[in-house]
Amino acid sequence: PSIVDLCVHQASKVCADYEVTLLNPSNLNEYISLPEISSDIPASNKADLIRLMLIEQYGGIWMDASIFLTEDLEWITSKLDRHESFLFYSDECTKDTRRPISENWFIAAPIGSDFIKNWKEEFLSCITSKKPKSFYNDMEDRDYHLQGLTKPDYLLCYISAIVVLNRKKYNII
């Protein structure tokens, strides 16, 4: 779509020192090997796994192609040597800002981030289970942890992040 072309062009212009890589089904296997995943898993959940696998393996920045940048990302990347990850959180879903609901349309992390590794492993456990959509249904204190998260069976990756963040304290900005 033309909006994506505009956003990618802008990212390349604003972040001229960065390599912008556009992924598609024909070039994805040049970067990662996806595990066997049921054909019942929605494309959005496969995309969630892809972004986590790429960030874990290569570090750097994942941005959805429809993000329009107005400035370079140095204000984020300059902090990554001291932090596990940079994430945005959902104002709509977060009821307690001490426990923000992490978004995944923009993720920045150094290579080897424990948080990203653990998030990916948790999410992979969910989507390779026999019933991914109900994987977190029996989660202890589920309503407390999910706060205002709508469509939990669609936003499984968000729940995986919640689970990981509840297990251990990470240095995330």
Could you describe each region identified by the protein language model?
Residues P1-D48, A65-I173:
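Glycosyltransferase-associated regions of secretory-pathway enzymes
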